[in-house]
Amino acid sequence: MKLRVSAVQYHLHTINSFKEFENQVTHYVKTAAEFKSDFILFPEFITTQLMSIDSDNIFSSINQLPQFTEQYYNLFSSLAKETNTHIIGGTHVIEENGKLYNVAHMFYPDGRIGKQPKLHITPTEVDEWNITPGEGLQVFPLSKGTVAVLTCYDIEFPEIVRMAKAMGADVIFCPSCTDDSHGFHRVRYSCHARTIENQVYVVTTGTVGALPTVDFMRANYGQAAVITPNDVPFPQRGIMIEGDINNDMIVTADLDLDLLYEVREKGSVTTWRDRRVDLYPDFEELVKIKNELIG
C-alpha cells in the first residue's frame, strides 16, 4: 500500500486580509492536488501570518488568533472536500476555557476535523505567548494506514513517538516552525532518530520567509523532508526527498507501507522488534492496559 504525501514550505510574509491567506493556502493545496497527493502537510504556526494584517497592530497579539478559527476551519475543510485529500493544516492557536493551545488539525475529505494539541511547549511559547501544553496523544486510522501528528518540539521526545508507534502509527507528520539553523537541526536530527528507533516514516516541514511586524516570527528557517528508516530498501541517508532550504516550494513523495512492514520483520536491523522491554517500558503493553481501562 502506498501513500502519496506533499509537504509545503510555507512562505510567511505580511498580508492585508484573510483573503490573501486563503489565496496562498489554496495555491499550495491545488498544486499538491495536481500531483494526486493523499496527504498535504502545512507547517506549524502558519496562521501567525494573520497577525500581520493590520498596520495598527490590532491583530498582533497571539490572543487575537482564535478569532480566526471559524474561517480557518471553513477554508481547510472546503479544500479537503474539493480536492478529496487529507490536509494537515499546520497548527492554529485556539482558546479553550480561557487557555491558549497550539493545535495541529487534520481535515478529512468528508468534513471531519481531527485535533492534536502540541504536547511539549517551548520556553518561548510559554513565556511570550502563554501557550498551554495539550493532554493526550491520538492517532488517526485511515483507509491507507494509521498516522500521528507531533508538532515540532514534540518530535524531540522519544517516548511520545514510541507511544504513537505502539498505537499503530506508521507515518508521523511533524509540522514545525524554527527561527534558525540550531532549532531546525534539532528537529531534523530528531526526525531521523525517530524513524530508526520506531521503523516509521516521518514527514516534516517548516515555515520560511519572515513576518517583520510579528514578534518572534521575524525569522524562519525551514525545509520540508520525507524521512525513512536507514536500511537497504531505503535511501542511504534516510531522505526520500527534501526541499531547498528557505525556499517557497512543495515536495512530494510516495510512502510504501508494505516495504516498511517488510523491513520491520526482515531488515538489516529490527529495532522495534528488538526492544528490551525487560529493561525499560513496553509501550505496546502500556497502550493495551490503557485501552482496557478506558473500555
Which residue stretches match the model-derived regions?
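Extreme N-terminal starter segment of soluble prokaryotic enzymes
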Residues: M1-A7
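Hydrophobic residues at beta-strand termini and immediately following loops
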Residues: V8, Q116, F140, G243, ...
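Short polar catalytic/cofactor-binding loops
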Residues: Q9-I15
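Cys-nucleophile CN-hydrolase/nitrilase-fold catalytic domain and related Cys-dependent amidase chemistry
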Residues: F18-P109, T178-A193, E197
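CN hydrolase (nitrilase-like) catalytic-core segments centered on the catalytic cysteine
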Residues: F68, Y72-H86, E156-D248
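Short beta-strand scaffold segments in enzyme catalytic cores
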Residues: G89-T91, V103-M106, Q138-V139, T204, ...
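Active-site catalytic loop in hydrolytic enzyme cores
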Residues: I94-V171, P175, D180-A193, V269
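C-terminal beta-strand edge segments of enzyme domains
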Residues: V208-G295
